[in-house]
């Protein structure tokens, strides 16, 4: 699998993808799979690369540790970038009549008390999950909050004056080494705690909350989950118009990503790099060799477009102002970013 290359012709792109993925599918059924999985998407092929050497479906990540049939993989699907998409969720609804483990009232419905007694009732109860891929999380206003909850407008009649209901799509369980905070709001990242411990805490909370666990998962189970997800790197590996994104001198794809240096403060534009290294505004050099289109004429326009996008990201000036914790802390009304 390591040397597999996908090439696209304008007329044969769909057929090539079908054949390519069919081959992958026949090799991906054992308990301990190879270290690469490929999935077609609307613009080409995405790849999941496992730095640990393989996707072991015997891992606790795939086991239901709670009481409602859910596992981590219920909301973190390999073929959907290790999150979920409305399209994938809708397909699961139709196949299961809305009884797949992702469809649980505790947080999949617009309200935990929503009617799920019939297929149509479930379709209505899970409409935000079906149409937007959103999970409901209700949390109280934290002590010392810098805001007040003064009004509630809830079309589902499910929020009270002390809790805030938030609908969020599950974050990808991939590329986790690059996180500076865990969860949308960073609540799993208290000051001074390591990323590993943050992910352990997040996994435990997911089991007890989303999976409605009756028993707190063991340290061994949590370590198993975190070790697995920490080894996953996911990225687009081939484009239907530009071809392979990680060959012939360019460096896209998840394997290259797995080799990327990273630490908190790396290449910091405000001078906070712990090594003291100066900021380099040329953040990305993945596709420099495509500035001229490369050596494949049929793909040159798309490749040059990708290279231009990289240049824009690196060089287009963006004035940053009015950001609490940044402009005020530094005493700079405007900070130029790119």
Segments from the language model and where they lie:
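Periplasmic c-type cytochrome electron-transfer domains
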Residues: 28-338
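Bacterial N-terminal signal peptides
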Residues: 12-23
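Bacterial N-terminal signal peptides that target proteins for export
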Residues: 1-13
């Amino acid at each position: 699998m390591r040397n597999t290359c996908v090439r696209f012709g304008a007329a044969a792109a769909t057929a090539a993808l079908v054949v390519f993925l069919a081959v992958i599918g026949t090799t991906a059924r054992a308990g301990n799979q190879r270290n690469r999985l490929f999935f077609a998407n609307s613009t080409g092929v995405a790849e999941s690369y496992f730095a640990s050497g393989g996707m072991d479906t015997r891992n606790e990540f795939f086991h239901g540790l709670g009481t409602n049939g859910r596992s981590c993989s219920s909301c973190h699907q390999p073929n959907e970038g290790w999150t979920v998409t409305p399209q994938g969720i809708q397909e699961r609804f139709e196949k299961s009549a809305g009884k797949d483990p992702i469809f649980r009232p505790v947080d999949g419905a617009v309200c935990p008390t929503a009617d799920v007694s019939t297929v149509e009732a479930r379709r209505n109860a899970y409409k935000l999950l079906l149409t937007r891929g959103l999970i409901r999380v209700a949390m109280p206003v934290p002590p010392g909050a810098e805001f007040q909850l003064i009004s509630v407008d809830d079309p589902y009649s499910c929020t009270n004056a002390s809790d805030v209901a938030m609908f969020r799509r599950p974050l990808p369980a991939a590329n986790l080494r690059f996180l500076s905070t865990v969860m949308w709001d960073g609540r799993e990242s208290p000051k001074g705690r390591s990323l590993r411990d943050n992910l352990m805490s997040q996994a435990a909370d997911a089991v007890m909350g989303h999976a409605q666990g009756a028993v707190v998962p063991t340290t061994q189970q949590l370590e198993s989950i975190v070790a697995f997800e920490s080894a996953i790197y996911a990225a687009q590996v081939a484009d239907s118009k530009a071809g392979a994104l990680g060959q012939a001198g360019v460096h896209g794809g998840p394997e290259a990503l797995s080799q990327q240096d990273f630490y908190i403060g790396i290449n910091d534009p405000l001078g906070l790099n712990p090594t003291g290294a100066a900021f380099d505004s040329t953040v990305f050099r993945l596709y420099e060799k495509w500035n001229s289109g490369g050596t494949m004429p049929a793909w040159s326009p798309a490749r040059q477009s990708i290279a231009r996008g990289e240049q824009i990201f690196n060089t287009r000036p963006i004035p940053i102002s009015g950001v609490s914790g940044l402009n005020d802390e530094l005493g700079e009304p405007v900070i130029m970013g790119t």
